[in-house]
């Protein structure tokens, strides 16, 4: 994935944008009135070429993939690249401790799903903690924490499966899959 920060000529109105393009998902996340963090999923080969190319070439490709919804974009931070990998923690609870969201798993940065998963973890844990406290039970008890971990497993599995599938769909150039993906994107765009 490629990351950087850009300035736009049109304010972002605190709105996050994500485009699912044939070359990979592209997200612009608001950090200030006219500034967005960029998270751009590309193949390793594409990412290397974009990192080795000029800033002007990088911006031209970024603008072409994103469009002009925020006007013209300019870089305000260095470009960085890092490999995407899916990492799952073996356990999300231990002795009187819980880890949640992206602290438990490293998901592909697609559709804000790591953030959304973290929010759902917090809501579920808060509800369970309130119930445990109202019943005057130990909120750090091993059986309680295990129950929490079990309650979150299905959502974690589903979310991880979804994000992994989206990345595989966009990084696969098998002709039939690429054609189906491009048709789907064209339909979503209209």
Per-region residue spans from a language model:
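C-terminal helical "tail/cap" subdomain of flavin- and related membrane-associated enzymes
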Residues: 127-190
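Conserved FAD/dinucleotide-binding core of flavoprotein oxidoreductases
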Residues: 21-83
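Short Gly/Pro-enriched turn/cap motifs at secondary-structure boundaries
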Residues: 16-20, 88-89
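Glycine-rich loop(s) and the adjacent beta-strand/alpha-helix scaffold that form part
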Residues: 3-12, 22, 31
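A conserved FAD-binding loop/helix module that cradles the flavin
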Residues: 108-121
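A short, flexible beta-alpha/helix-coil linker loop
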Residues: 9-11, 43-47, 104-106
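Short FAD-binding loop at a beta-strand-to-alpha-helix junction that anchors the flavin cofactor
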Residues: 90-110
């Amino acid at each position: 994935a490629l990351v950087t920060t850009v300035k736009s000529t049109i304010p972002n109105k605190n709105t996050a944008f994500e485009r699912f393009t044939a070359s990979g998902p592209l997200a612009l996340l608001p950090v200030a009135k006219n500034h967005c963090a960029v998270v751009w999923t590309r193949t390793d080969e594409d990412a290397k070429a974009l990192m080795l190319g000029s800033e002007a070439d990088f911006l031209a490709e970024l603008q072409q993939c994103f469009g002009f919804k925020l006007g013209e974009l300019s870089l305000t931070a260095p470009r960085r690249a890092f490999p995407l990998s899916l990492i799952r923690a073996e356990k999300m609870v231990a002795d009187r401790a819980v880890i949640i969201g992206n602290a438990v798993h490293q998901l592909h940065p697609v559709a804000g799903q790591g953030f959304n998963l973290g929010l759902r973890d917090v809501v579920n844990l808060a509800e369970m903690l309130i119930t445990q406290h109202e019943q005057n039970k130990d909120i750090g008890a091993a059986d309680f924490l295990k129950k929490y971990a079990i309650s979150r497993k299905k959502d974690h599995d589903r979310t991880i499966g979804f994000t992994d599938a989206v990345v595989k769909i966009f990084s696969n150039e098998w002709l039939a899959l690429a054609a189906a993906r491009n048709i789907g994107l064209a339909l979503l765009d209209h």
